[in-house]
Amino acid sequence: MLMHSILIILVIILTTYFTRIWPFMVFNAKNPPNDFVRYLGRALSCSVIGMLVIYCFKDIHILKPPYGINEITAFLSVILLHRIFKVFVLSITLPTILYMVLVQSHALEKAFFNP
């Protein structure tokens, strides 16, 4: 059983490593990315933010507590961070972490909606 778990972890590590290193092996100084790949690099950052916003708001029930307060807080943090820093990675990562912490801890629900 232990050997099986170790093999699974090893396969996951190698797969993750390969998917991370693959673009650098394919696109290098001798073989630069074409215009379409460069376009995807610019456009996908906005697409990822849009996808995260849709995922965030998909289960909101506006008419019952907590009225989407966790989602709205995370969404406003995306807007605020991106307007201030204009760094996509920061605008995606920190609000995602904030959203996950708020949803799993129920901190805002406890603060505003518990009697």
Curated annotation (Swiss-Prot):
One of its GO terms (cellular component) is plasma membrane. Keywords: Cell membrane, Membrane, Transmembrane, Transmembrane helix, Transport. It is found in: Cell membrane. It is a multi-pass membrane protein. The chain crosses the membrane at residues 6-26, 43-63, 84-104. InterPro entries: Brnchd-chn_aa_trnsp_AzlD. It holds the Pfam family AzlD. It comes from the Bacteria. Belongs to the AzlD/HI_1737/HP1330 family. This is Uncharacterized protein HP_1330. It comes from Helicobacter pylori (strain ATCC 700392 / 26695).
